[in-house]
């Protein structure tokens, strides 16, 4: 009887997690966590841009981080002569890796958020607003929310684990299950957005890059 009950609970949970309406409502229910992660991203972006512009050390550190980022992009083996499908698949692989990593890291995904803010602030400083608008914004307006959602999902997952392991104030089984379900809904939504962002980056952004660098 207990096994049958657990199976029924699991099936109900999976049905809820993959319900599109529930997935779309999840950001509203978890807006406080998402706003917190968004605030970390925005403050990091603004603060790091100010530091990169005004302090040489941060500009130098930005050089190192950006060079490592370029090496990572080169490892994807994307060139201006590649077909769109190859580019999109390579971007998807990279984006989904970041998405899952963000989720697994939990609260430590805020460090990933800060590093991405550093890269964006450095690109804006190094290449100027025009290049930033053309080469980052087309896919960035989708990719950045996806990054924030995956990090938010990771934070929620951590909250569930803390409740489970330490059994603090709201550490009931129902509360733990709620956190895990909500975190997975945000993860699924972030994956969807990362897929869309990859298509935009592999088509629109890529075409803009070809025009600018040809």
Curated annotation (Swiss-Prot):
Keywords (A to Z) from UniProt: Cell membrane, Membrane, Transmembrane, Transmembrane helix
Topological category with respect to the lipid bilayer: Multi-pass membrane protein
Chief subcellular location: membrane
Cellular component terms per the entry's GO annotation: plasma membrane
Transmembrane segments: 33-53, 104-124, 132-152, 153-173, 186-206
InterPro entries reported in the protein's UniProt record: SpoIIM-like
Signal peptide residue numbers: none
Keyword tRNA processing: no
A family per Pfam: SpoIIM
UniProt feature coiled coil, ranges: none
Species assigned in the record: Methanocaldococcus jannaschii (strain ATCC 43067 / DSM 2661 / JAL-1 / JCM 10045 / NBRC 100440) (Methanococcus jannaschii)
Name of this chain's protein: Uncharacterized protein MJ0706
Compartments where found: Cell membrane
